[in-house]
Amino acid sequence: MSGSTGERSFADIITSIRYWIIHSITIPSLFIAGWLFVSTGLAYDVFGSPRPNEYFTESRQGIPLITGRFDPLEQLDEFSRSF
């Protein structure tokens, strides 16, 4: 039989009242914070991704697809100018 490390067992932790008091507050709080982060649009600003209505503008309705194998830099310049 191995020696004891002095740590509480997992079953002992999840059956304690203190565990559930703490986690009944923190788990819903994390869910609400994540929902607010996404629903307010802050996630778009933090990560720099375009919002759903910014993918296609009035002037640029096509997909920026590079088709030329030997002149991709020129096509990238054209796409950059259209922004």
From Swiss-Prot:
Question: Could you tell me the superkingdom of the organism this chain comes from?
Answer: Eukaryota
User: Which residues are heme-binding?
Assistant: 23
- InterPro entries the record matches: PSII_cyt_b559_asu, PSII_cyt_b559_asu_sf, PSII_cyt_b559_CS, PSII_cyt_b559_N, PSII_cytb559_asu_lum
| Membrane-spanning intervals of the chain | 21-35
Give the UniProt entry's GO cellular component terms. chloroplast thylakoid membrane; photosystem II reaction center
Give the cofactors, semicolon-separated.
heme b
Q: Which SUPFAM superfamilies match?
A: Cytochrome b559 subunits
Q: Which family does it belong to?
A: Belongs to the PsbE/PsbF family.
Q: What is this protein called?
A: Cytochrome b559 subunit alpha
Q: Which organism is it from?
A: Glycine max (Soybean)
